[in-house]
């Protein structure tokens, strides 16, 4: 295991929160409504059993963190009138969770996380942010490096009061998790068009996500209703995808097999994100600025996802001082 991905000791946690962490580094979208959020803490690495915590101001939170130096710190995506009871729900952020260690398709073979799968998770996040902005017209979007992946947090007013069902539909669109429509009619005759022939809307979204999956297949993955032979054929010929020669790729796979591959990829796309996080209106998420003690990485807001490198920006000082 690489040094920065080793668990933090209690002494290292104490050093981080007393010497490096600063409550003023909290993102504004959390600091501005601190008193409306529920906080939760994991003190021993067994999960956030210390729940229903509320902090009226940054000073009280800072005092708690420095005294307790928790294994993990979380805050709710929901805003409450009475957060100490988790009652009086008002609204919730729209969340997308991409965890590098849980990606069903990734080109590395590590047991947890490594620079390769973290970068592939970042690629997914960039595509998602582009879709949220370009297709859905959303703008109040924050990307958070969680320590083992990324959280995309959306605070546009029009999505904050949505229920779980609508959030699930947004997830399916953004993830490319629906099989794209192939059959169309002009009122007189019907015809078929593949997703790569329609460079707009959901078909464009799906094509981008399918490209990501196909370019990162190792060749040993199980894709529903697709043979291992077809998966290997896709891997051998993915240079066609790189060159945007989708029609030739479809011919190599086989016109009758290709729709099954598309359907299988749509199911994989759904598993590239944790759907439970998106639909849970009362979820607690790792607190930006806090330490992910399992991997000794800092959970932090990412100002520029295009150039962000967690191995340069999210490593606490104590990691460099390990023997």
UniProtKB/Swiss-Prot annotation:
Keywords: DNA replication, DNA-directed RNA polymerase, Magnesium, Manganese, Metal-binding, Nucleotidyltransferase, Primosome, Transcription, Transferase. Gene3D superfamilies: DNA primase S, domain 2, DNA primase, PRIM domain. The keyword Magnesium applies. This is DNA primase small subunit PriS. GO terms for biological process: DNA replication, synthesis of primer. Heterodimer of a small subunit (PriS) and a large subunit (PriL). It comes from the Archaea. Its cofactor is Mg(2+); Mn(2+). Belongs to the eukaryotic-type primase small subunit family. One of its GO terms (cellular component) is DNA-directed RNA polymerase complex. It comes from Methanothermobacter thermautotrophicus (strain ATCC 29096 / DSM 1053 / JCM 10044 / NBRC 100330 / Delta H) (Methanobacterium thermoautotrophicum). The lineage of its organism: Archaea, Methanobacteriati, Methanobacteriota, Methanomada group, Methanobacteria. PANTHER family: DNA PRIMASE SMALL SUBUNIT.
